[in-house]
């Protein structure tokens, strides 16, 4: 996961 998506188990903050 590169962005915060609904239903995503892994949340990776990239900026």
Swiss-Prot record:
One of its GO terms (cellular component) is ribosome. GO terms for molecular function: rRNA binding. The keyword Translocase does not apply. Keywords: Ribonucleoprotein, Ribosomal protein, RNA-binding, rRNA-binding. The keyword Signal does not apply. It comes from the Bacteria. One of two assembly initiator proteins, it binds directly to the 5'-end of the 23S rRNA, where it nucleates assembly of the 50S subunit. One of the proteins that surrounds the polypeptide exit tunnel on the outside of the subunit. Belongs to the universal ribosomal protein uL24 family. Part of the 50S ribosomal subunit. This is Large ribosomal subunit protein uL24. It comes from Brevundimonas diminuta (Pseudomonas diminuta).
């Amino acid at each position: 996961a590169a962005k915060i998506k609904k239903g995503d188990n892994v949340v990776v903050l990239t900026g």
